[in-house]
Amino acid sequence: MTKMNVESFNLDHTKVVAPFIRLAGTMEGLNGDVIYKYDIRFKQPNKEHMDMPGLHSLEHLMAENIRNHSDKVVDLSPMGCQTGFYVSFINHDNYDDVLNIVEATLNDVLNATEVPACNEVQCGWAASHSLEGAKTIAQAFLDKRNEWHDVFGTGK
């Protein structure tokens, strides 16, 4: 397979076992700051996906709430394949802490009573949301918290 510019295109998606959180890449800036990009994989690639209303609400809830748990978050974005999200941190390389931040954020999702910015002024597709769908996705991921570190399903 020819090496491609996009890191995830070089990942053999048939070898990973969701759910997991993995360091997908790092980038150092000119002043020494380092961006750490994590792959938060909720669903098994090419086997499952998150339905759009639940995924969309989960994106809003996570993007808003994750920043309550870390001031190092640069961005949280959904994957187009609808199997997960990317989250990027600046100058924060503690993998176990990232797992704890994601866990706390997903617990916020479970406790949410509304989806933030779920209106036509603040959202580009305000009609496509499901708070209950987001909670279902979050709960399923939290239920497998002990598997998040095991990207390839080796049990290690």
UniProtKB/Swiss-Prot annotation:
GO biological process: quorum sensing
Cross-referenced HAMAP family: LuxS
Catalysis performed (reactions): S-(5-deoxy-D-ribos-5-yl)-L-homocysteine = (S)-4,5-dihydroxypentane-2,3-dione + L-homocysteine
Protein name, as recorded: S-ribosylhomocysteine lyase
Self-association state and partner proteins as the record states: Homodimer.
Source superkingdom: Bacteria
Lineage start: Bacteria, Bacillati, Bacillota, Bacilli, Bacillales
Role: Involved in the synthesis of autoinducer 2 (AI-2) which is secreted by bacteria and is used to communicate both the cell density and the metabolic potential of the environment. The regulation of gene expression in response to changes in cell density is called quorum sensing. Catalyzes the transformation of S-ribosylhomocysteine (RHC) to homocysteine (HC) and 4,5-dihydroxy-2,3-pentadione (DPD).
